[in-house]
């Protein structure tokens, strides 16, 4: 069974048994529930919903199902076709729509797809809204409108160029400074929608572009998650081409990974750190936000600029809520997700790229030189599998009590901040697992801290 239902939408492998995988009836059921939620929030209004997708092989099929279902529910549709996740989010706002559905499984393998659900601000649904959709999906007896109430497709126009124009128009994107540096950039778009937008954005910034996996066929050339073990190809190409840097995006282009001129990883955590350094240089004393599992380096850089750092629960919707609460000038997640409120409240690899290249141009440094200006931390990510009979919440409470004298945050699992390192323990919502994230000044220290807490969990569980 691979159909995973959550407050942000549903995802699963395409085909197989209904209610156990992502099948046509499941797509129809959850799209109908979403349309009902939006109608409930807008009584008596003729709804308009934006639909966009990444380049997955199943994308067009799922998009057709979503579009047809929305029309059957009486909603009008603006279909932006092949579009990035941030682009679809921005289209909702630009087109003044009532919501949006993004068809993408992000960094998951090619057999997966998903529906991500947006509100009228082009942001992910709140926890309460997501739960309402899940509840509505299980209700029976919904009556669809008659033939005169069917919606219409208002347009089928790409939004990618508009997205690029809006990024380049930002006051802190210094197009001329980047053009003067004439960066040579290798870009790996894993044969998804990034292959359409990233080369064009880079060329508009005056870069010489070497394209790698930029044909949007949906046949991912490697594991689509932008982790170091999946990026050996671009590292080799950078060295061979004597490029200044490499840019890697995931299939829906909300995550940005950077590779230095020597083929070494800039490290995803430091995408946000570097962009924040630039934004804070223009907004001294500004606040920042990332999630609890993100690097301490962002806090260090924020405090260097006289600002205040805040942490949210994991998940884009939680980061955005905390950013709005604190008035943060920049934020995001440590997986390369940059959220710049001056454009929109969503992770966006295009704005991340433009702001990063501006900073690199202003600094007059190489990638490795810039990376060396930031505090160096090492992260270890582990998990411990438990039996279904074990009360995971009770285990986490025990850990929290043991370390009550330390700086403990329990808004999302349990995070313990020590003077030189930290550990974050999170339970899975779909399986009996505790994820163990640690960060320290060396890899050996991070690994040792993880093993220490894995040992404590085993002791508590008597395993």
Model features per residue range: what roles?
Residues 51-53, 187-189, 260, 342, ...:
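Short glycine-centered, acidic/aromatic-flanked micro-motifs in structured strand/loop junctions
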Residues 13, 113-241:
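Gly/Ser/Thr-enriched, mixed-charge loops and adjacent short helices
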Residues 131-165, 169, 260-334, 339:
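Proline/glycine-rich low-complexity loops and linkers
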């Amino acid at each position: 069974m691979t159909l995973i239902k959550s407050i942000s939408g549903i995802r699963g492998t395409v085909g197989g048994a209904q209610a156990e995988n992502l099948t046509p009836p499941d797509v129809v059921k959850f799209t109908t529930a979403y349309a009902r939620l939006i109608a409930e929030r807008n009584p008596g209004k003729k709804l308009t919903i934006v639909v966009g997708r990444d380049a997955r092989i199943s994308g067009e099929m799922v998009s057709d199902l979503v579009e047809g279902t929305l029309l059957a529910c009486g909603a009008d549709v603006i279909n932006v076709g092949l579009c990035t996740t941030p682009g679809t989010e921005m289209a909702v706002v630009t087109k003044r729509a009532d919501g949006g559905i993004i068809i993408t499984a992000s960094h998951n393998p090619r057999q997966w797809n998903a529906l991500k659900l947006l509100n009228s601000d082009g942001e992910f649904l709140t926890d309460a809204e997501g739960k309402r959709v899940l509840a509505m999906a299980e209700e029976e007896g919904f009556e669809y409108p008659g033939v005169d109430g069917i919606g219409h497709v208002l347009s089928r126009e790409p939004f990618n160029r508009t997205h690029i124009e809006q990024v380049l128009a930002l006051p802190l994107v210094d197009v001329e400074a980047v053009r003067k540096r004439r960066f040579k950039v290798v870009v790996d778009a894993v044969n998804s929608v990034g292959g359409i937008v990233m080369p064009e954005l880079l060329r508009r910034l005056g870069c010489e572009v070497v394209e790698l996996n930029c044909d949007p066929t949906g046949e991912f050339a490697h594991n689509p998650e932008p982790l170091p073990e999946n990026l050996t190809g671009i590292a080799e190409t950078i060295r061979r081409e004597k490029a200044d840097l490499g840019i890697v995006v995931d299939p829906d282009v909300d995550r940005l990974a950077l590779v230095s001129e020597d083929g070494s990883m800039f490290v995803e955590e430091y995408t946000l750190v570097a962009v924040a350094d630039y934004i804070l240089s223009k907004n001294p004393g500004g606040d920042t936000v990332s999630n609890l599992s993100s690097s301490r380096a962002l806090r260090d850089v924020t405090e260097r600029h006289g600002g205040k750092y805040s942490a949210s629960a994991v998940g884009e919707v939680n980061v955005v809520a905390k950013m709005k609460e604190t008035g943060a000038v920049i934020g995001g997640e440590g997986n390369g997700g940059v959220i710049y409120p001056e454009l929109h409240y969503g992770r966006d690899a295009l704005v991340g790229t433009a702001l990063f290249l501006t900073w690199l141009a202003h600094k007059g440094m190489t990638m490795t030189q810039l990376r060396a200006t930031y505090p160096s931390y090492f992260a270890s990510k582990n998990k411990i599998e438990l039996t279904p009979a074990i009360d995971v919440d009770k285990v986490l409470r025990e850990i929290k009590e043991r370390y009550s004298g330390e700086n403990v945050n329990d808004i999302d699992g349990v995070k313990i901040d020590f003077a030189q390192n930290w550990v974050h323990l999170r339970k899975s919502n779909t399986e009996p697992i505790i994820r163990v994230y640690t960060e320290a000044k060396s890899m050996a220290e991070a690994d040792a801290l993880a093993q220490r807490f894995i040992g404590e969990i085993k002791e508590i569980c008597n395993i």
